[in-house]
Amino acid sequence: MKTFTLIAILTCAVLVIFHAAAAEELEVQDVIQPEDTLTGLATLDEDRLFECSFSCDIKKNGKPCKGSGEKKCSGGWRCKMNFCVKV
């Protein structure tokens, strides 16, 4: 019984992560607007804590996604799912 519960919880977690990633991708492609709340999950935005905390220290075209010691991306860059995206 514990095994089935664990499998169910892990499956739900994977589905939530997949749905959030798909919503993020659609937002980047401008298919949905960030203020769209009809998706079932709130879209990820700049105010979420983990947005730039993963690896926004990556450099894109020689420039960092965010300045050293800064909490948010700057210079027209946005950190999305471990990738630097030009806004």
UniProtKB/Swiss-Prot annotation:
Its main location: secreted. Residues 24-48 form a propeptide. Contains 3 disulfide bonds. Two different connectivities are observed in similar proteins (C1-C3, C2-C5, C4-C6 or C1-C4, C2-C5, C3-C6). It comes from the Eukaryota. One of its GO terms (cellular component) is extracellular region. Expressed by the venom gland. The keyword Signal applies. GO terms for molecular function: toxin activity. Residues 1-23 form the signal peptide. It is found in: Secreted. Pfam families: Toxin_20. Keywords: Disulfide bond, Neurotoxin, Secreted, Signal, Toxin. Belongs to the neurotoxin 12 (Hwtx-2) family. 03 (juruin) subfamily. This toxin causes paralysis and death to sheep blowflies. It may inhibit voltage-gated calcium channels. This is U1-theraphotoxin-Ct1a.
